[in-house]
């Protein structure tokens, strides 16, 4: 996924009210940009470090700029736009990066499924193959060298695991895909210390036939894309 037009750079001052962040520009002026992340962003906020933001062509938007990347003290990157995970996954499936998800004929987004009024992120279908239901999650929490999900209690994430188990029990293929948008995360594990119920459900899901995959992103101020698989420690 190319960043077009090119991202602009500033320095983080603070994130607040969940969807807003103040940044400082090179000329010393400050401005407010949109923060497209509904999570806690635990361990992802580094005041004074570089941020990169995109510009919207929509003149009706209250905030014309959107936070895309956070620089880390170690020179790495964190993808802030959690909503881009689905698009990154779709792009990687089409390009054959995710080897486990090749060989299907069609890809659909936001299809109704399950028995809890849910919509699947990605549905793959192919001749003489079971339908493949894929839930995509963005992973950015790094603690003690380990990547974790979720970064806050996630009732929605718990529901999605139940739905995936339901689809697996019906004979479909069910996949949980972690899109790792932190350049210093090399493996993913359930955050039992944050959401114990999610961790328990994930173990049950794997025993029920749900596949769990994780792919790391390569990130720069010009591009972000899924690049390589990494271990998931359930």
Swiss-Prot record:
Give the superkingdom in one word.
Bacteria
Q: Which InterPro entries match?
A: SfsA, SfsA_C, SfsA_N
The cross-references to Pfam families, in alphabetical order and at most eight, read:
SfsA, SfsA_N
Q: Name one GO molecular function term.
A: DNA binding
Record's family?
A: Belongs to the SfsA family.
Q: What is this protein called?
A: Sugar fermentation stimulation protein homolog
Q: Which organism is it from?
A: Shewanella sp. (strain W3-18-1)
């Amino acid at each position: 996924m190319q960043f077009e037009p090119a991202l602009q750079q500033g320095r983080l001052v603070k994130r607040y009210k969940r969807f807003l962040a103040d940044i400082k520009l090179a000329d010393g002026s400050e401005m407010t940009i949109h923060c497209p992340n509904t999570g806690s962003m635990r361990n992802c906020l580094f005041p004074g470090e570089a941020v990169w933001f995109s510009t919207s062509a929509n003149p009706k938007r209250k905030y014309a700029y959107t936070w895309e990347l956070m620089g880390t003290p170690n020179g790495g990157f964190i993808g802030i736009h959690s909503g881009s995970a689905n698009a990154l996954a779709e792009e990687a499936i089409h390009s054959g990066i995710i080897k486990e998800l090749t060989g299907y004929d069609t890809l659909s987004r936001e299809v109704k499924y399950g028995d809890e009024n849910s919509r699947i992120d990605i549905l793959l279908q192919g001749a003489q193959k079971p339908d493949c239901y894929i839930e995509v999650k963005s992973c950015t929490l790094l603690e003690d060298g380990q990547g974790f999900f979720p970064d806050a209690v996630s009732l929605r994430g718990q529901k999605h695991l139940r739905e995936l188990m339901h689809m697996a029990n019906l004979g479909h293929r069910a996949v949980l895909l972690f899109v790792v948008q932190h350049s210093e995360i090399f493996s993913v594990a359930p955050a039992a210390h944050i959401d114990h119920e999610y961790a328990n459900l994930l173990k049950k899901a794997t025993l029920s036939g749900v596949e769990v995959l994780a792919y790391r992103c390569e990130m720069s101020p010009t591009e972000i894309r899924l690049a390589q698989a990494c271990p998931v420690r359930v």
